C-alpha cells in the first residue's frame, strides 16, 4: 500500500507559483470532487494554519514609503499636455468645435491613465515584487488595481454630480498630494463615499426586503413542467471562458447535443464540470439549457428548470423555497457593494481607445498590403488593419515585434523613424453594436464680448419661429467680433450719432474709474455725468470729454450736456444751409486768442427724444455775474411780469428739487435783497428774541452763529423755526411818515429823509419795510439792495462770421434772458452752493414764411463731429425735414433681414431720435458706400471696442533698406503718415501711462464697401472711419436688434501693406473680409489673430479682432445675426451621442435602477430606426402575424437576458459571484406581467388590467379568441403590489389601500405563498410542510359530488328563467295585437 502511495505521489506535478483567490477556488472544487468534503476541510485547515504562520513571520505592514510612484509618469503627463495644447490650438483656429475638443481631451487623458495603470504592475514586478502594496492589490484579498493606481499613478478624470465628465484631469496621485483645484474636483467624484455607511446598509436591507417580497411564493413543486423550449448558452467570441463555464454548471440541458451522429449529452441531463470539459473537448457549438425563464408554471418552478441546489450540488429538492434564496443571494452582497463604491467613486472608466507605444527608437516596418488608408474618428489620417498585424521596429541592437489586433488604426507610415514610447497604433475598445448611447446637449458659452455673425444661412426651428433660436443646415463658423457692450438705458448718447468720435479721459482720482455704462436709472431720475472741456488739452488731438462727478439729478425726459467751449467771446456759430438742415459747429479756442471766460460753461439742452419744437431753448449760459451765494428776495420794482414758456417745457431741479417756472422780465434791471436765513428744528432753543438787534458772530442757537448783524425776525411754524437776520439800519419814523403796513418799498438813490434831528441822502437803492412788534411802537427796517443791470444779450453778429450769417435763410436764433425766480419770492440758498438768478438762453425758431418749413412743428437734432485734415469740428445738426420711419422686419426667405416701410401709425411710442433712417450714397474710386440706421429697441445696447480687441500687423519689410528708403520718401510726400502713426488709426493721441484714457468711436451703421482699390494717396481716403457690417456673400445685412457700437482708436490697429506684395498677390481688398488665425493676407506675412478688415488705406489695413467657433450641422444657434453678445451668454448648443459610462452609477444604485426599471434620461438617436428596421425585416421574412408574434416573443426573451447581464456586470465589477439562476428568478417575476390593451375587446379581461403572461396565453387558447396585450416591465415595488395574494401585498406597504381595494373587488387569497401563511399562522408550504400542501390540493380536485350539486342548481335556475322568458314574450305579443 505504501509503495502504491509513493508511486501516486511521484506522478503528481509539483507547482511552484503564487496562488490567488480564483486558483484557490478551483483547487477546493477539485479537492471536493476527488476526496470529498471531510478530507477537503482537513486540508483547508492546514492551509489556514500555514497562512497564519507565514503572515506572522513575514509581518507585512503598509507604510507610506511602500507607495512607489511610477518613473514614466512625468513624460506621459507632458505628452498628454502637449496633445492637449495642439487640440486647444485647433479649437482656437476654428478647426475643431467644443464637443470634439472635449471628447478628444477625455480620450487623451483616459489613455494616459490606462497606460500608467499597466506600467504600474510592470514597475512593481521589476523593481520590488515583494512590495506590500503590490502583494495586497494583486492577491485578491483586499483592494484592486484601480485603487492602487489612484494611490501611486494618477487619479485621472472625474465625473460631476450630473454624471458628465469634468475635462480637467487630476494629474496627481494620492501619494503626491492634490492641489486645491484637484481636491475640489476629487470631492465631486467621491461624492458617493461621503454618505454615511448606516444609510447604505439600510438601503441594502430595503432592497433585500423588496426582492424577497416579489419571489417569496416561488417554491419547487414539480420535477418537470414539460417545457420544450431552451435558451442558447453557446460560447461567444466576446464571452470569457470562465464566465461561460460558470453559466453552464448547475443547469439542465434542454435538448440532446450531437457531435455528428453521436449524442454526447441527453436532454434533462445535469451539467457538471465533467460534461463541460466534454463540451470544450468536442467544441460543441449549439448548447441549449433550461432556465427559470422558460418554466411553464405560473407561480412555482420545477426541479429541471431550476437545476442544481447551490448547497449540496444535486438537483434541487421538492419544496425548496428557491425564491427566498434568490432574493437573499442578490440582496446580501448589496452591503459590500455600497461600502466598496467609495474607493473608485466618480473615477471615469470608459470604453475608449487604447494606445500601443513603441518599445524603443527605430524604424517601423509592416506589410502595406494588409492595411488600408482611412481616417480616425477625429479626422486624422491612419491605416486600418482587418486582421492581426505584426509590426517590427528595427533599432541598432535589437528587433522588436509588436502584435496589433484586428480593426486597429496604425498611426505611422511604413519605414518611418519612431521614438521610444511614441504612439504607433490605436486599439478600439470592443463595443457591441447595440451598446447604449445617450443623447447629450452641450451648451457652448461665450468667453468674450462682442457682436455675433455667422458665415452661412440658418433656418428657424419650427417651435422658435419668432424667437432667436436658429438651426444650422451645414458646417459653418460663428464669429464674435470683439467689443465691450454697455447696456443702455434708452437715452445714452442721444446727442452723439453715427461716426462720432470721442476721446474719454477720467482725470478724477477721488472717484473710481468708470466707463460709459455708469448711467444708472433710479426712481425715474437719471444720474447724469457732465461733459466738460479741459482747455489745456485742446489741440490737434481733438477734444477730450471728462466724465466727472454727477452734476445733479435731472428729469428723465430732458438731457443737459455741459460743453464749456461753446459761446465764448472768441467762439462763433456757423450755420449753413445744407438740404433743409443747418449745422452749428462749436469751435474750441485757437492759439494766440484770449483765454475762455471762467464760467460753468454752456449747456446744450436737447430732449431725450431728439425732438425740438418752435421757440425751444437750444442752449443756455449761466453768467457768473448773476450768481449769488446767500439767500434773499428778488424784486422787479412795479413792472408787471409775464410767463414765457409752459411749465413742462422748461424743468429745472435745484436745491430741494422743487419745480419752478421761468419768467422773463420787461425791464433792464432787477434787485436782490440779501438776508440771512436759518431753518432750525421746532424743538431747538433760540438764544435771541424776535425783533431784537444782534451783531456779527452772535450765537443764535446751539452751535449756530450769525454771519451778519442786524434785525432778527423769528417765525415759528409746525415743525420748524425760521430765523431771518436783516442787515441794514433801524429808523423810528416821525408822526408824519406813512409806510405801508404790508409790503416793503424800494427807494431809488437820492431820496432824503428829513426830521428835526437828522437828514440823510441815500446813495444806492434801499428797501424799506415796516416792523411792528407786539404792544410796541413800530419802526422801519432799511436794508441794502444789490442792483443788477441786464445787458442786451450777446449779439448774433459776434457769434457768427459775416459770410455765414447771409446763408442762414430759414434759421432764427435769438438770445433771451430769463429770471429764474418770481417777484418777491424768497430764495433759499443751501450752504456752500450758489444761486443763479439770470440765465441767458438761445431760442431756436425757423422761418414761418417759407412754405416748406412753416408746416413743420418739430425738428430732429443730432450731434455730428466732422474730421478733415486732422482737424476735428463738432456740430449740432437739426433736420428740418421729417425723416421717413422704417421698420425692421423679418422676411420669409433665409437671406437675412430686410427693411419694410412703415407709415408709423402703429408705433406712436417709438423713439424718433433712434428710429430715423439715414441713407447716404456716394461714389469713391468705383466703390459705393451705403449707410443705414435701424430702429432701436427700447433699451439699445452699445458696444465699446477697446485696445485689447484689435491688433496691428506692423510695417512690411521686403528688402530691408529699400523698404526703409521708400517709407522715408512716402513720409516726405505725405507728412500725415507720421501724424497718423503717432495718433493711431483715428487720429487721436496714443495712451499715456499715467492717464486712464479711453478713446471711443461711435457707430450704429452698417456700411458696405463692395470693391475698394488700394490707393497710394492717403489724402483721398478720409472716409476710412466708416464702418461696415456685411456677410461673406457681400449682402448688406440689417441686424435685429440694431446696436450702437463704440470703436476704440486703439482697437483698430494698422496692418501695413507694401505695393510689391499687393501687386503680386491680388489687386482688390474688400472691406468686411474675415481672416482666420495665421491666414495669409499678403505674400510675405501671415498675421497673428483672426479678424475682420475695417479700414483700407493705401499702405495699411485696420483689422478688428474676432473670435470664431466651429458649429456642425444640426447645432442650434442662440441669438440673431449682429446681436451683441455678453460674456457667459449661450452661443450654440450641440447635440451629440456618447456611450453610457457604466461606472458612474455603480454598486447598489445601479442594481436598484435596473430592478426598479427606471427610465433612462435619453436614448440613442439610432435606436428607434433600428427597431423600425427590425419590424420591417422580420415581417417581410415571416409574414405579418408570425412576424409580430415572434418579434414580441424575442423582445421579451432578449430584455430578460439583457437585465440579467446588466446586474451580473455590476456584481462582477465588484468581485461578487452570484449564480445566474437567482437573478433569473427575480427578472422572471418583473417581466412576467402583461398589460391588456384596448385594441381588441376581450370577454376575459378589462383594458388596462395587469395579468400574467402565461395566464393570458392560456386564457386565449381556452376561449379561442385573441387577447391583445403588450409586454411591460414592472419595477420591484410595483411587482410586489401586483401579486395574486392581497395579504402579501398589504403586509408590504399601503396596507389600508390594498385591503380596501381587495374588499371592494371581492378578491380571494388562495394562501399559496409563504408570507400570507405566516401572517395567518398557518403551515408554510415549503420544506416539511410541502407534503401537506400537495395532499390538500389533491383533495380539492375530488369534487364530483360538488359538481353534481352545482349542475342541479344550474338546471333548476335555468328552467325558472326560461319559464319567465316565455311568459314575458307572450304578454308582448298580446299587447301588439290589441294595438294593431
From Swiss-Prot:
InterPro entries: DNA-dir_RpoC2_beta_pp (IPR012756), RNA_pol_beta''_euk (IPR050254), RNA_pol_Rpb1_3_sf (IPR042102), RNA_pol_Rpb1_4 (IPR007083), RNA_pol_Rpb1_5 (IPR007081), Rpb1_funnel_sf (IPR038120)
UniProt GO BP: DNA-templated transcription
Domain of life of the organism encoding this protein: Eukaryota
Reactions that this protein is recorded to catalyse: RNA(n) + a ribonucleoside 5'-triphosphate = RNA(n+1) + diphosphate
GO molecular-function term, one example from the UniProt record: zinc ion binding
Cofactor: Zn(2+)
Key word rRNA processing present: no
GO CC terms, sorted: chloroplast; DNA-directed RNA polymerase complex; mitochondrion
Cofactor details (free text): Binds 1 Zn(2+) ion per subunit.
Protein localization: Plastid, Chloroplast
Chief location category: plastid
Chain residues that bind Zn(2+): 225, 295, 302, 305
Key words, A-Z: Chloroplast, DNA-directed RNA polymerase, Metal-binding, Nucleotidyltransferase, Plastid, Transcription, Transferase, Zinc
Enzyme Commission number(s) of this protein: 2.7.7.6
Oligomeric and partner information: In plastids the minimal PEP RNA polymerase catalytic core is composed of four subunits: alpha, beta, beta', and beta''. When a (nuclear-encoded) sigma factor is associated with the core the holoenzyme is formed, which can initiate transcription.
NCBIfam families according to UniProt: rpoC2_cyan
Family: Belongs to the RNA polymerase beta' chain family. RpoC2 subfamily.
Biological function: DNA-dependent RNA polymerase catalyzes the transcription of DNA into RNA using the four ribonucleoside triphosphates as substrates.
Descriptive protein name: DNA-directed RNA polymerase subunit beta''
Native source organism of the sequence: Piper cenocladum
Taxonomic lineage of the native organism: Eukaryota, Viridiplantae, Streptophyta, Embryophyta, Tracheophyta
